[in-house]
Amino acid sequence: MRENELEQRQMEAAKIIVALKKQESELQEIINSQYQNREQLESLHHLDTLDIQQIEAHKAYGLKLIVDAQNKERIIANTKVLLERKQKEVREAHKKVEILKKLKEKQEQEYYKEFLDAEIKEIDDITSARFNLE
């Protein structure tokens, strides 16, 4: 039962990691778009004729990309916090599983010790009874 809980927590953490990687990839795409937009804007300034509408469109798109990048960075930060919490839950679940394993091993050792003690006592009783008969 505890092992199922551990597996569930690990699966949840894995899903968060996948989501985080996707978000980081999307942020990188936004950064690349910003770079390309900046290059296109600079190339517009070097043309013989200035197209104000295109320049304004690139500036507006650049501002949108900045906002998108900031939002994505916030989402990534929140996802990292969520991942840290989930990793803590995984560690706690793993700790519980290990404790139960150790407890089970200890109980098995105690059982076998009691079994062997009972067997030794029976052998001693049989041996004692034999000597008493002779």
Language-model features: locations:
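Charge-rich amphipathic alpha-helical interaction elements
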Residues: 1-134
